[in-house]
UniProtKB/Swiss-Prot annotation:
Gene3D superfamilies in alphabetical order: 1.20.58.800
Quaternary assembly: Heterodimer composed of major capsid protein 1 and major capsid protein 2.
Naturally occurring in which organism (per UniProt): Acidianus filamentous virus 1 (isolate United States/Yellowstone) (AFV-1)
Role summary: Self-assembles to form a helical, filamentous nucleocapsid mesuring 900 nm in length and 24 nm in width. Together with capsid protein 1, wraps arounds the DNA and maintains it in an A-form. Capsid proteins probably maintain the DNA in A-form by non-specific desolvation and specific coordination of the DNA phosphate groups by positively charged residues. This certainly protects the viral DNA under conditions such as the extreme desiccation of its host.
Taxonomic lineage from the root: Viruses, Adnaviria, Zilligvirae, Taleaviricota, Tokiviricetes
Stated name of the protein: Major capsid protein 2
Amino acid sequence: MVNKKYRQDSKDRYQYKQYIYRSIGGIVPPEMAETVTANQTAQWEAGFTPYHKLRLAIKEICKTDGIPNIKWGMYIAFGEKLLKSYLKMKAGSASSDMIAEYINNAISAFSSRTGISQETAQKIADFITSNY
């Protein structure tokens, strides 16, 4: 089973694995493997935390709303898709009205397709807009 918890040694373990992968066979010089590994580790670390924090929050929201844990995956998928789109729109030139309209449309479309609770989806959207 893969360990999906971010621990104190997660960054070091990831960096070690990437260095081994990059330097296998001796084709790549060690300095280049170190540079690539350091850059890739920084990108990994920057992208890991937002989604991890979101997953933990979604699990708590689902627990408090009484959603069976077998359905949590749908809520996590919704939250990750919404976060990706939200960050893209926020970085671009989208106005707050456009973002709010997109979120409302995403909630209704996803809930009609999958049958998830609109109230819970709205709580997830509120978490995303207030924390990112």
